[in-house]
């Protein structure tokens, strides 16, 4: 329906039963409109619970489910890598809202939606598989960021311990298996069922997002050792200079949240860094007076 109420396309279906069921329909718009919305209504009384709603064009980029116009804009930037699934979305504010790989794979309509740090709800329709496929389609290097067993430290952080921590570590290992494991493996079989029997390319794993301190280093070490035992070819990325405290480190993702003056004063910050090392930084200039 366009903003003045004109119906551009419509369809109907009969809903029955008490089970969660997928319904599909095709809508063909009578004309172009840049200010329209999808409206769902019931002609008769009753209660309908909606679990997952998606409106997508028939033709997606390379048939892989993403809008062609958006992907082509990204392609035009000639990106070399993609860090996903994001930043604070990885950590969550509670253990239940922390990102888990297994919630983001399989049929999109069966994935649980979650309310994330920035106060919006995501259906997780753009999940682990879709990010890997996008990287493959555009020739980008995938850089997966896993939860390290703690929620956002910028808020009231919750530390996972015991079985909860073990479960989160296993989730990371399962994600790697999904990406690069054999199609005969547990998670490789699911990948194959999603249309990609051959392993994806995935080299980099960032352990945690913007985490720091002794609690982080304990969890970083735990994940680092487990990953290297099973997947020695994976290159890991730390959130801080953990090597200063005796932890193994291959690459550090330096995060800076500060003013423009802070960056201007440190224009020579990297002058003495080893030119043969891998450098990865995430700057975010901001003015505290306006942000």
Give the location of each predicted region.
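Extracellular carbohydrate recognition and processing domains
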Residues: 6-32
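An active-site-proximal structural segment forming one wall of the substrate-binding cleft
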Residues: 64-75, 131-134, 164-199, 256-259, ...
């Amino acid at each position: 329906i366009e903003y003045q109420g004109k119906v551009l396309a419509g369809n109907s279906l009969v809903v029955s039963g008490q089970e969660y069921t997928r319904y599909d329909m095709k809508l063909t718009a009578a004309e172009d409109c840049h200010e329209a919305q999808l409206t769902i209504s019931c002609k008769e009384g009753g209660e309908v619970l909606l679990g997952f709603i998606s409106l997508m064009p028939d033709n997606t980029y390379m048939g892989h489910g993403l809008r062609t116009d958006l992907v082509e804009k990204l392609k035009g930037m000639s990106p070399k890598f993609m860090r996903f699934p994001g930043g604070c979305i990885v950590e969550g504010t509670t253990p239940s809202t922390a990102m888990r790989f297994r919630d983001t794979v399989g049929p999109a309509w069966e994935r649980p939606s979650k309310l994330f740090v920035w106060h919006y709800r995501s259906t997780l329709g753009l999940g682990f598989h879709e990010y890997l496929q996008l990287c493959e389609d555009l020739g980008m290097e995938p850089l997966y960021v896993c939860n390290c067993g703690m929620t956002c430290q910028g808020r009231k952080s919750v530390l996972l311990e015991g079985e909860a921590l073990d479960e989160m570590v296993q989730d990371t290992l399962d994600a790697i298996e999904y990406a690069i494991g054999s199609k005969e493996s547990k998670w490789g079989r699911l990948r194959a069922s999603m249309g990609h029997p051959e392993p994806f390319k995935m080299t980099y794993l960032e352990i945690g997002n913007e985490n720091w301190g002794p609690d982080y280093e304990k969890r970083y070490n735990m994940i680092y050792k487990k990953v290297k035992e099973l997947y020695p070819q994976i290159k890991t990325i730390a959130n801080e200079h953990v090597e200063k405290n005796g932890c193994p480190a291959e690459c550090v993702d330096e995060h800076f949240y500060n003013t423009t003056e802070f960056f201007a004063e440190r224009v020579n910050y990297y002058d003495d860094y080893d030119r043969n090392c891998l450098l990865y930084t995430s700057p975010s200039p901001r003015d505290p007076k306006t942000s």
